[in-house]
Amino acid sequence: MKVGLFGANGRMGRVLVEALDLSEDAQLSVATVRDDSPWVGLNVGELAGIGKKDVDCTALSDLSGNDADVMIDFTLPSVIESNLTWCIKNKMPVVIGTTGL
């Protein structure tokens, strides 16, 4: 299963990057960060401290509906609405791990 991640540069995002790297059944296919983030273009494995992987951090505005089978959201309450709007528009299943809602 191809898994996409909203908030790859956060604490839990980095944990999920590492967990997906160890998974036999799920692979990280896209990792998003804010459009103005300094992490855009950075390799997600290097960001998570696990070495270079096949995925670079992508600006949210560059996300395609074909990039993943499911998205996981570990962002902030202030941006979750826009992420959910994107998921609804693209008929993308989403798992929400964001706290403080």
Specify the residue positions occupied by each region the protein language model found.
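NAD(P)-binding Rossmann-fold cofactor-contacting core
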Residues: 22-49
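Glycine-rich, highly charged phosphate/nucleotide-binding loops
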Residues: 46-64, 72-80
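Short beta-strand/turn micro-motifs composed of small residues
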Residues: 7, 33, 98
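N-terminal Rossmann NAD(P)H-binding glycine-rich loop of SDR-like oxidoreductase domains
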Residues: 6-9, 13-18
